Each structure stands twice: as structure tokens, then as C-alpha cells.
């Protein structure tokens, strides 16, 4: 993990989510790549290690649970944050069981995403917010 700009992936099949979240995180100094295609994102995590991944759960193509499992398998230190419009207690429990850092229900405020990503970054850097 680098000590300067942390590398973040945003994956959501709704383009508006990526369009809003990417600049909000870049403004905080993160290096951000966003994807609306889960297959393209899965290919990308095979070649690049991300510090933090923000992913939707319900997507066309590769399901978010499957994606986060593969991401954690490839890079156990990667912190995964789940965003979903289908938030249930069962889904949240399953996400945490699979190593998710945090779980955010849609609709969300950009400040919520920024706060959770900052907390994940602090954990990676060994500091607190």
C-alpha cells in the first residue's frame, strides 16, 4: 500500500453514481477509477491492486458479493465498502462476514461516502480519524 495517494475503485452499474462519487473522492486527494461494467472491473482487479473499493451489490453481469470476494481474495488488505439500494440486515451481515469494511444504503449523501472512505484510509494508514 502506498503512503501517498490511495488508489480507489468505484463500481456501480448506475453511471450517475460513478459520475458523482469519483470527483467527490478525487477532491479529497484519492486516485479514483470508476467502472459501470462489473466484467471490466473484475478484469482490472486482476492487474491492479486497489487500496479501497466502493462497490454496488446488485449489478448486471458479476454480482457485487462475488466481486468483493474476488477482490478480497486477490488483495486481502483492500478495504471494501458496499453501497446498495437493496439493504437488508441479512445482506449487511453477509457482507461483513465476507470482510467488508462498511455498508452504505442508497440513497446516500456524498459526505457519507467521503467519511467512510476516509475511515478506511485511516485504517490502512494505521491512523484514526
What is each PLM-predicted segment?
Residues 108-118:
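C-terminal output helix
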Residues 18, 60, 84:
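The feature encodes the CheY-like receiver
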Residues 29-36, 44:
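Short hydrophobic/Thr-rich beta-strand motif most characteristic of the beta2 strand and flanking loop
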Residues 43, 65-77:
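Short amphipathic alpha-helix used as the core "switch/output" element in two-component signaling
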Residues 36-37, 63-66:
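Acidic catalytic/metal-coordinating carboxylates
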Residues 53, 57-58:
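The short loop immediately C-terminal to the conserved phospho-acceptor aspartate in CheY-like receiver
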Residues 19-27:
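Charged docking surfaces used in two-component/phosphorelay signaling
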